[in-house]
C-alpha cells in the first residue's frame, strides 16, 4: 500500500517520520485559492483541492494533504516578509490566544473513499516586551514561518500553554490522521 503526502512541507514530513510512517511525496503545486472565509472551511477547502489534484495523477494509493493557517481576531496571519511585518505580528500575538487551524484530506484510491476534517489548537502567547520582540526577530528565522513564529523554535519560550494537538500547530494533526486511517482499515505498518 502506498501513502502519498501531497506536500513538500519540511515540518509535515518530520511529523510523519517521527511516527514511522512510510510515504512518498507528490506536492500538488496548485494555486492556493479559496472563496471560503471561515478559517475551518478555508483550510479544508485547500486541503481538498491539493489532495484531489494529486489523486488525479495517481493510479493507486492513499493521498494525505493538509493546509494550515494561524488566525487571530478572525484574520489569517500570513508569513511576514519584512522585520517590520514580523514585529507587527508579534505585537498582535503578545498576551493573547491565537488559533492554529489545519484542514486535512485523505483520499483512499484503493477503496474510493474521501475524508476531510479540521483540527483547531489554541496557542497562548505571553505578553512580550519590546526587547523580547527585538531579540526574537534578530535570533529566529521568522521569515520562513507562517505568522512569524514556530512553536518548535525559539518562540516556545513565550508559549506557556496550548489547548489541543501540538502537532496540529506544526501542520499535521497526526493523532487524528492516525484515527482516520484506522477508520479506513489501515495501520501504520500497512504502508511501504
Model-derived regions, located:
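N-terminal beta1-alpha1 ligand-phosphate binding loop
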Residues: 2-21
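Anionic-ligand binding patches
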Residues: 3-4, 25, 38-192
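Short, glycine/serine-rich, charged loops/turns that create anion-binding
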Residues: 10, 30, 111
Amino acid at each position: 500500500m502506498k501513502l502519498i503526502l501531497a506536500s513538500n512541507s519540511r515540518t509535515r514530513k518530520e511529523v510523519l517520520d517521527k511516527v514511522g510512517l512510510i510515504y512518498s511525496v507528490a506536492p500538488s503545486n496548485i494555486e492556493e485559492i479559496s472563496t471560503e472565509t471561515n478559517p475551518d472551511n478555508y483550510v479544508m477547502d485547500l486541503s481538498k483541492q491539493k489532495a484531489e489534484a494529486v489523486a488525479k495523477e495517481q493510479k493507486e494509493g492513499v493521498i494525505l494533504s493538509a493546509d494550515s493557517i494561524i488566525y487571530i481576531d478572525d484574520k489569517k496571519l500570513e508569513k511576514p516578509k519584512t522585520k517590520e511585518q514580523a514585529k507587527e505580528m508579534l505585537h498582535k500575538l503578545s498576551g493573547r490566544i491565537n488559533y492554529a487551524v489545519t484542514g486535512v484530506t485523505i483520499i483512499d484510491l484503493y477503496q474510493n473513499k474521501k475524508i476531510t476534517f479540521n483540527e483547531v489548537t489554541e496557542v497562548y502567547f505571553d505578553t512580550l516586551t519590546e526587547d523580547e520582540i527585538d531579540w526574537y526577530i534578530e535570533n529566529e528565522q521568522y521569515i520562513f514561518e507562517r505568522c512569524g513564529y514556530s512553536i518548535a523554535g525559539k518562540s516556545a519560550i513565550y508559549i506557556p500553554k496550548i489547548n489541543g494537538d501540538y502537532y496540529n500547530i506544526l501542520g499535521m494533526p497526526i493523532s487524528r490522521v492516525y484515527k482516520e486511517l484506522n477508520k479506513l482499515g489501515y495501520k501504520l505498518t500497512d504502508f511501504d
